[in-house]
Regions:
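A generic signature of intrinsically disordered, low-complexity regions enriched in glycine/proline
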Residues: 19-20, 94, 106
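Short, glycine/acidic-enriched loop or turn micro-motifs at the edges of active sites
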Residues: 33, 93, 113
Length: 114
């Protein structure tokens, strides 16, 4: 399985379950509740105590982090069934409800071209 060519920064998290048990058929965006950079996102998901990760992170400036290889299941949505089949994307967002994130930064067609 290949990773996105849109990645600007790589910091691989130890927080994942290894190889997926289902093929990818969906995208799950999730807000990180903060205007984080990709460097900050990478550091957050390096901490094993947080028990969280994502395949990709999108920083406040639109740069893209590779955090967990697409071939592996990340720990993003609190659903094993979903995370096994989704490309998970943590997005920088506002810090107050409704936690707006700029979804125009996500290139939705990119994962479907593979």
């Amino acid at each position: 399985m290949s990773n996105s060519k849109l990645v600007n920064y790589t910091k691989l998290s130890p927080n994942h379950s290894g190889k997926r048990t289902h093929s990818i058929d969906r995208i799950t965006p999730h807000c990180v509740v903060g205007q984080c950079s990709v460097e900050t996102l990478g550091n957050i998901f390096m901490n094993t105590a947080c028990e969280a990760s994502c395949n990709y992170g999108i920083g406040y400036d639109g740069r893209v982090l590779l955090c967990v290889d697409e071939g592996n299941r990340s720990w993003c949505s609190s659903s094993n069934a979903n995370d096994q089949r989704a490309v998970t994307i943590e997005c920088a967002s506002d810090t107050t409800a409704p936690y707006m994130m700029n979804l125009s930064l996500i290139h939705i067609s990119e994962p479907t071209r593979r």
